[in-house]
Amino acid sequence: MVIISYDIADDKIRSRFSKMLQKHGAIRLQFSVYELRNTKRIMDNLVVRIEDFSKHFTPADSVIIFDVESSHLTKYGNAIHRDQPIVYL
């Protein structure tokens, strides 16, 4: 499982980026944080798409991908509830 977090200033690019993540099966946890569980092939394709998007980023924009073991997660609060908790301690 991976957690993808992004900070993109341009509304149009941010909206397209969010839709692209959802198209690849990502589930929105918070406004700019997604969870994704998929095959290595799909993940590799997603990384290529993110690299394509990065060509349009400003120096202030960023995308961070966390490779996470779901057995080491804990979640608190009112985020989307999934089978596994989702907060790092």
Short names for language-model regions:
Residues 2, 33, 47-48, 63, ...:
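Extended aliphatic helical segments
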Residues 1-41:
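Extended, hydrophobic alpha-helical segments
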Residues 32, 40-48, 69-77:
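Short amphipathic alpha-helical patches
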Residues 36-60:
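Short, intrinsically disordered low-complexity segments
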Residues 28, 46, 51, 85-88:
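Juxtamembrane helix-loop transition sites at the ends of transmembrane segments
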Residues 54-89:
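C-terminal structural segments of small proteins and small subunits
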